Amino acid sequence: MKFRQKHEDFIVNEILEYELNDYGNYFLYKLQKNGIENLKAISYLSKNFEVPTKEIGYCGLKDRHAITTQYVSIPKEYGKLSLDEDNLKLEYVGTIEKPLKIGRLYGNRFEIIARAVDKDEFLKIADNIRNLSSGAPNYYDDQRFGSVFNGKFIAKEILKGNYEEVVKILLTSYTKSEKKQLKDLKRFIAKNWGNWDECLEYIDKKQIRSKMFRNMVKSLTYENDFKKAFKYVDNRLKELFISAYQSYLWNECLKEFLKEVIPKENRIYVDYSCGTFLFYENIEEELFDKLKEMDFPTIVSDVEYTDPEKRIIKAILKKERIKISDFEKLDFGKLKYTKRPIISIPEDVNTGKFKSDELNSKKYKIDLEFSLKKGSYATIILKRVFNIL
């Protein structure tokens, strides 16, 4: 099975709830991008139209490896804007009263092509698509865990007081998609760990522009204090570290809860970057009706939980060898308390027929369209359909 062999294989259209009017102070635009990161697109608009980035409102980040359409708001004082480039387009929609904010959307519509399908998988895939009416567990998927390397969560290492490991992850771990210059730097630091003068000399010699790397390494040349070096990490990154670990714990709590209510014969396990997901293959209507009305809270230190949440959270934290009070040690960022629906139910599901795949010899492809409410991951639905065969 293959996804995203072309950007056209993964199309995302934002579903926004808004009211146009004639008296608002903001212009609403459709922003379509192809293979461009969200923040880079916003930065480009800012420079091109001389609009400060803080004045460009949007509801959420969209996938880079896709064709995406979302909405942005810009104050009327900058005039009506338009852009028509190959990979980035901006189209005026109308006038709204308030700027767009993160999270203020209904959801997203997805148009996805799954490729390299074998003929003997047709029946099972078709059956799985029919069963989408009973939804799927509403896990956070791999996109949430970009700061996790070799199964190590930076926030967890901080809770353990292991700041050297935190700094080592930040300065030496890399992904395939990172630029060669940065990968070379991280390899050099890993090879010369502790020789901070040499590492700083390398940064200057190669004219590496990253302030974070330079400041962290320079700090270590003065004093081998990894906790102090960590202070040079951007606060937005620190918040991502917390968010990633909190999301992982929520996933583990959901999995533990599902173990209590899903019979063993109906459990299916699917791997992901931080462990395994538990899916259900079939579910009784009575249980489904119960689950679709339920949510599960995120873990924070200042909330009194009741069973079954309290019991499940305690079990997961014991497995992680941390206590809920440990979260009070975090002197940066903030754990966010929210209640997240236990299951995600795709709306308006449409599917095409299996067709010959022009990109993969002797294989087939199939189109799948559906809508999800905000916060739910399309890739979880794809795992439910295509990984349970």
Swiss-Prot record:
Signal peptide (from-to): none
Protein's organism: Methanococcus maripaludis (strain DSM 14266 / JCM 13030 / NBRC 101832 / S2 / LL)
Family: Belongs to the pseudouridine synthase TruD family.
Cystine bridges: none
Keywords tagged on the record: Isomerase, tRNA processing
Protein EC: 5.4.99.27
PROSITE patterns for the chain: TRUD, UPF0024
Highest taxon in the source lineage: Archaea
Active site: D63
Catalytically driven reaction(s): uridine(13) in tRNA = pseudouridine(13) in tRNA
Protein name: Probable tRNA pseudouridine synthase D 1
